């Protein structure tokens, strides 16, 4: 088996689908084209986290049943998508043990009360019943109790950055936590601490809406395995994201001009 550390821009969903337009499908096809993977093994055996379309990743991973050691620049050249990067790989005998997952969300700073958000976030840290802050998956029976290790919130004039660390997460759990904290920061919730206690209880059944997927990135899935990164692929990733940053800065300038002139 080989474990691959991967990154992607969020324009595709993650998990293998019949239509073939997902992160896993693109990586599998590249490995097949290189002759490293047999078609019967095209579905990954294991992964670090399943993400929805719109959610980016810098440190997810996939595990494939394969014997040949891959040359990563060659794999990268075969990827038929410019928003996926195979950053590193390592041969393994057993599946990795996950220590924690780290998500980060970037919110526009609309005069949020950041200190109130920080105070409220402390109520979410620890082991709680998170069913009301997740999307119910009727096809699977999952224990809704999860443990959050830490939540860190920082801000500047334009953005609020929220980092969430946990053992594992329910479907849409991070995005719903973000929406809750954002609404608290906008003073949309009268008694934040009391409401958090309510929404973390099994008696509350209303749930809570999610924030948009586009602000979320899976920063890392920390495991007990160290994976060496390929310098060529890292350069490719940095160049691509730098180009995106420059385009976004130009767009930001245009937006500021329009808003200041009207």
UniProtKB/Swiss-Prot annotation:
SUPFAM superfamilies: Pseudouridine synthase
Binding residues for substrate: 103
Domain of life: Archaea
Role of this protein: Formation of pseudouridine at positions 38, 39 and 40 in the anticodon stem and loop of transfer RNAs.
CDD domains in the record: PseudoU_synth_TruA_Archea (cd02866)
InterPro entries per UniProt: PsdUridine_synth_cat_dom_sf, PsdUridine_synth_TruA, PsdUridine_synth_TruA_a/b_dom, PsdUridine_synth_TruA_C, TruA/RsuA/RluB/E/F_N
Family to which this protein belongs: Belongs to the tRNA pseudouridine synthase TruA family.
Organism: Methanococcus maripaludis (strain DSM 14266 / JCM 13030 / NBRC 101832 / S2 / LL)
Record flagged with keyword Zinc-finger: no
Keyword annotations: Isomerase, tRNA processing
GO biological process: tRNA pseudouridine synthesis
Keyword tRNA processing attached: yes
EC number of the protein: 5.4.99.12
Gene Ontology terms, MF aspect: RNA binding; tRNA pseudouridine(38-40) synthase activity
Protein's name in the database: tRNA pseudouridine synthase A
Reactions it catalyzes: uridine(38/39/40) in tRNA = pseudouridine(38/39/40) in tRNA
Annotated catalytic residues: 52
Pfam family, one: PseudoU_synth_1
């Amino acid at each position: 088996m080989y474990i691959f550390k991967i990154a992607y821009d969020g324009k595709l969903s993650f998990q293998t689908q019949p239509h073939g337009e997902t992160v896993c499908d693109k990586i599998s096809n590249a490995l097949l084209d290189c002759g490293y993977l047999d078609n019967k093994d095209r579905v990954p055996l294991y992964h670090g986290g399943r993400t929805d379309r719109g959610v980016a990743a810098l440190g997810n991973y996939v595990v494939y049943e394969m014997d040949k050691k891959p040359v990563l620049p060659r794999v990268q050249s075969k990827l038929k998508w410019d928003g996926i990067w195979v950053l590193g790989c390592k041969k393994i005998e057993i599946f990795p043990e996950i220590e924690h997952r780290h998500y980060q969300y970037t919110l526009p700073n609309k005069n949020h009360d950041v200190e109130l958000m920080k105070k409220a976030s402390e109520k979410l840290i620890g082991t709680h019943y998170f069913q009301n802050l997740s999307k119910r998956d009727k096809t699977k029976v999952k224990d809704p109790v999860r443990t959050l290790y830490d939540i860190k919130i920082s801000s500047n004039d334009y953005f609020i950055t929220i980092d969430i660390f946990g053992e594992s997460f329910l479907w849409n759990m991070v995005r719903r936590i973000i929406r809750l904290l954002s609404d608290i920061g906008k003073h949309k919730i009268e008694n934040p601490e009391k409401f958090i206690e309510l929404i973390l209880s099994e008696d509350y059944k209303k749930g809570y809406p999610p924030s948009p997927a586009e602000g979320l990135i899976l920063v890392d899935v920390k495991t007990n395995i160290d994976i060496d990164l390929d310098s060529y692929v890292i350069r490719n990733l940095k160049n691509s994201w730098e180009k995106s940053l420059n385009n976004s800065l130009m767009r930001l300038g245009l937006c500021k001009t329009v808003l200041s002139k009207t």
